[in-house]
Amino acid sequence: VVSWKRTQRGIIMEALKLPKKAQKDLNVIFESMVARKIKKERELTAEDFIYQIKRLAHPRATSPIFGHISEYVEGLRELAQRLRKDNDAIVAAHRARYGSADKGLPWLDLRPYELSGATAIDRYTYRIRIKGKYPQFMYWLAMPFFAPIPYEADRFYAQRGMNQGRNITFDWYPVGTGPYMLTENDPNARMVLERNPNFRGEPYPSHGEPEDEARGLLRDAGKMMPFIDRVVFSREKEGIPYWNKFLQGYYDRSGIASDNFDQAVQFSVEGQATLTPEMEAKGIALSTAVATSTFYFPFNFLDPVVGGLSESKRKLRQAISIAVDFEEFISIFANGRGIPAMGPIPPGLFGYREGEAGINPVVYEWVDGKPKRKPIAVARKLLAEAGFPDGRDRKTGQPLVLSLDTVARGPGDSSRLEWYRRQLAKLNIHLEIRATDWNRFQEKIRSGNTQMFFMGWNADYPDPENFMFLLNGPQSRAKTQGENSANYQNPEYDRLFEQMKNLDNGPERQAIIDRMLRIAREDAPWAWGYHPKDYALSHQWVFNSKPNQI
């Protein structure tokens, strides 16, 4: 049985008295704490949650998480097969009558369909049955994929003509029970949230991270939320007007663009970011946090030059990993807002190690209490051992030419691409830039027709599995359309991943992660990249707010 608990990561669940039987067959029971209003007509019930879980299997919804979640929710895959069969019959009949099935398909009511993995116990309680053990499932439940959906709304938006140039769709006019209603929805100009008069109310948190109390973030503990009646999101298309309006107080919060960085932030001798006197005089506050994101530089393992697990290919990738100086990249292109990545896992998540224990020993040394990138001479030695002394093929004498696939976004990218060329030029490697549009770039990655490129990943949920799976062989983008864009495959890494992914956080899981990181660092499927650091500015009248990195 589980209960809801609010943490700094959002709403997650805390297991209570979970029986050992749950190791094989986890029954998760959810209880709606109070009756919640959808409209004045009726309250939220357990069936609304179940209806949405069924929608994950709906062939017209094309849920992006169906493939993954159907491995765990009992009966979801079988439900999808039944729905697909019935939907095919509806489509065939519609096409026979109207000559087309592109628009106006009749509504497919999911209520009559049984789903063994999601059943109602009573009006406000439902059970989800999971195959095996999957601790990360609690994070999925905090995501929109599991938000309750009333069948009435599903039926309403399925009416003929609703989405024919009118944007009368669920995502534009959502139905829910939260503290605010979306009363104005024009993403190109303005979006407005207004207080929901039917909201049940919810107390402000009474506990948080250790520093929250010192920062005054728990001063309103226990008071009923929401505290404000209206939230307005405005889109400013030009950076300078946006920044000036923030300084004048028209906007409450702001990020910091590169052009305004020096006006807002200065660094101490120790490298600590602080506000400039101008910002302090305005009463503006600065908050910083390393994002739960990783930007990385993959090598395509299907490529005959940079891919593969042979010793020579491994040393080639290691040499490039040392040569591409991401400390310099962060300084030049991110105003110092980031930290070099030592592996896939960003700081703040279980599995990430601080200090000397956490460095990538292939790329870094520990010097004077901090990591230091190995000298370029080490990279040149590795390159020679890989069969390319001084950047030339030992057998043919031909210069080594590699390619970087990227999206052509405009002249502003030229300095960044030239920087990549200079990094490989340290090894006398010539880098060709293959710029293309976004769709063609994605097609190249899907088909494995790349050599090197740049990618990023933001956490779906705060668990190391959500980053380590980016190097899991069965997740190969070219082979299975998974998220392993490097198409990296190491049998030992994959075996350890299967052991690690569903373990609870603890010494056993940490030990397995350490072994996986040693393998990945040695194989160097990525040049590792960096974790960005978010900077946010707030005016003095903004309270009870802190960055949420998920």
What are these regions (language model features)?
Residues 81-125, 129-232, 237-241, 376-377, ...:
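Gly/Pro-rich hinge or "lid" segments in bacterial periplasmic/extracellular proteins
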Residues 1-79, 127, 242-245, 309-319:
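Aromatic- and charge-enriched surface segment that lines or borders ligand/interaction sites
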Residues 180-181, 306-307, 339-386, 408-416:
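Structural transition elements
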Residues 1-3, 20, 31, 131, ...:
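Periplasmic solute-binding protein
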Residues 48, 240-251, 258-259, 266-269, ...:
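Short helices/loops that flank or line small-molecule/ion binding pockets
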Residues 183-194, 219-221, 232-303, 327, ...:
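Extracellular/periplasmic solute-recognition and catalytic clefts
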Residues 132-135, 186, 190-191, 195-197, ...:
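Detector for C-terminal structural segments
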Residues 128, 207, 223-234, 396-404, ...:
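A local structural motif
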